Amino acid sequence: MMELDTGLVVLLALILGLLVGSFLNVVIYRVPEGLNRNWKLQAKQMLDLPLEQGEGERFNILMPPSHCPSCKAAIKPWQNIPILSYVLLKGQCKHCHAAISLRYPLVELLTGLVFAVCAWKFGATWTALSAMVFSAYLIAMIFIDADTQLLPDQLTLPLMWGGIVFHLAAYLL
């Protein structure tokens, strides 16, 4: 089997981490928002209250497409390039010039660095990949918890079961 250069593995892990960090920003914003929307919707249905316009619309990790929270302008794919787009846009929405939180590039950078450290420590192995997945979950949960004091079951339960399965596989193999 061909051995990969450590520097290349670390660089690829850094790039992957930046991309995953960009996705984690979506998770950090949308998972708690989706929970709140579902709770309100369920409460209104239980109380037989009328729904306001747009309340029943689909909202999840993928829908609606990314947009500026201030002016609701759609974000183009090039505006989602981790860190680089933040620098090119000077930390502002292209349309309304509202400030973009510094947390977005920080989450991307943190995730990229953590992935790079995992690759440096474990190399191109399944252990590195599982450490990256575990780290991505933890980063998302840290920021969600900091914002809302919630740890959503959508994140904690897969992490728990994944940890159990990974440990059993390592133990049995």
Q: What is each PLM-predicted segment?
A:
Residues 1-173:
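A membrane-topology feature that recognizes alpha-helical transmembrane segments
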